[in-house]
């Protein structure tokens, strides 16, 4: 699933492609993707004639800001946006098509069909699900070391499980939780409320630094991720532990181990991240 760096990269590339374009019509081919309004026909009707003013991001969600509404889109496992001309062949996995007045069209492709789209009035998107319960952005002034420490003190779950909870901080998924924990020298199964202040301060720093570096590298392509211009990310070349089971640790040489934490495959170094 795309995490913050991948979604931010998609946002940046997509904004350059479609900002200022006006929607002529919307073709919904897989209706279950549309979550709000309930009727896909109403979704299409409300978007017709709307111009894309900007594209924002909240956690792993893309926010399309139009004249009179905001579309909140989650890519889930395999969702991708691409700009095409209307005479280009149509892929069978394209499930929503936004046709623009200039003859181009934005196609939403999703092999797994897990993606979602919600339509709101401006401002309403922040007070309703799915955005309402999200925690702070990791690059925001709200996400401080003190905030993280107080949040983790309230749970006896593993620190990995706590960080994957989007109510703690948004944008982190399997890849970047594993990487941040490795950089901070914290075992993924460590109990969240047992971390010391020193550990939490370092973890806070490494979360921000890891995400910053990943955004600068265009995200990580470990399976099928590409941005809206068809380009892969490059941060996978800098990963310390994720996807490196049995390979030598880049710091100590010990083989990277893989276990399951909170139902998620988890990579770590048993020497650098002692329990």
From Swiss-Prot:
Pfam families: Fapy_DNA_glyco, H2TH, zf-FPG_IleRS. PROSITE patterns: FPG_CAT, ZF_FPG_1, ZF_FPG_2. One of its GO terms (molecular function) is class I DNA-(apurinic or apyrimidinic site) endonuclease activity. The active site is at residues 2-3, 60, 264. The keyword DNA-binding applies. Coiled coil: none annotated. DNA binds at residues 93, 112. Its cofactor is Zn(2+). It catalyses: Hydrolysis of DNA containing ring-opened 7-methylguanine residues, releasing 2,6-diamino-4-hydroxy-5-(N-methyl)formamidopyrimidine; 2'-deoxyribonucleotide-(2'-deoxyribose 5'-phosphate)-2'-deoxyribonucleotide-DNA = a 3'-end 2'-deoxyribonucleotide-(2,3-dehydro-2,3-deoxyribose 5'-phosphate)-DNA + a 5'-end 5'-phospho-2'-deoxyribonucleoside-DNA + H(+). InterPro entries: DNA_glyclase/AP_lyase_DNA-bd, DNA_glyclase_Znf_dom_DNA_BS, Formamido-pyr_DNA_Glyclase, FPG_cat, MutM-like_N-ter, Ribosomal_uS13-like_H2TH, Znf_DNA_glyclase/AP_lyase, Znf_FPG/IleRS. A zinc finger (FPG-type) spans 240-274. Binds 1 zinc ion per subunit. Keywords: DNA damage, DNA repair, DNA-binding, Glycosidase, Hydrolase, Lyase, Metal-binding, Multifunctional enzyme, Zinc, Zinc-finger. GO terms for biological process: base-excision repair. Involved in base excision repair of DNA damaged by oxidation or by mutagenic agents. Acts as a DNA glycosylase that recognizes and removes damaged bases. Has a preference for oxidized purines, such as 7,8-dihydro-8-oxoguanine (8-oxoG). Has AP (apurinic/apyrimidinic) lyase activity and introduces nicks in the DNA strand. Cleaves the DNA backbone by beta-delta elimination to generate a single-strand break at the site of the removed base with both 3'- and 5'-phosphates. NCBIfam families: fpg, PRK01103.1. Belongs to the FPG family. Monomer. This is Formamidopyrimidine-DNA glycosylase.
């Amino acid at each position: 699933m795309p995490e913050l760096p991948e979604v931010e990269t998609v946002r940046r590339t997509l904004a350059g492609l479609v900002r200022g374009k006006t929607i002529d019509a919307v073709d919904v081919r897989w209706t279950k993707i549309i979550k709000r309004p309930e009727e896909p026909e109403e979704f299409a009707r409300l978007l017709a004639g709307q111009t894309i003013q900007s594209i924002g991001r909240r956690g792993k969600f893309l926010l399309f800001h139009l004249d009179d509404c905001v579309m909140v889109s989650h890519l889930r496992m395999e969702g991708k946006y691409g700009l095409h001309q209307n005479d280009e062949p149509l892929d069978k996995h394209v499930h929503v098509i936004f046709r623009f007045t200039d003859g181009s069209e934005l196609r939403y492709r999703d092999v797994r069909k897990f993606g979602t789209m919600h339509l709101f009035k401006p401002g309403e998107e922040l007070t309703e699900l799915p955005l309402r319960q999200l925690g702070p952005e990791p690059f925001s002034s709200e996400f401080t070391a003190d905030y993280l420490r107080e949040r983790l003190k309230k749970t006896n779950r593993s620190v990995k499980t706590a960080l994957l909870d989007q109510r703690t901080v948004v944008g982190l998924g399997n890849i970047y939780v594993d990487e941040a924990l490795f950089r901070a020298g914290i075992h993924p199964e460590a109990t969240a409320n047992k971390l010391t202040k020193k550990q939490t301060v370092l973890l806070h720093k490494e979360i921000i630094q890891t995400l910053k570096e990943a955004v600068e590298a265009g995200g990580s392509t470990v399976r099928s991720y590409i941005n809206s211009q068809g380009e892969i990310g490059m941060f996978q070349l800098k990963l310390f532990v994720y996807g490196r089971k049995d390979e030598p640790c880049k710091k100590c040489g010990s083989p990277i181990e893989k276990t399951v934490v909170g139902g998620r495959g988890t990579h770590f170094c048993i020497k650098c991240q002692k329990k």
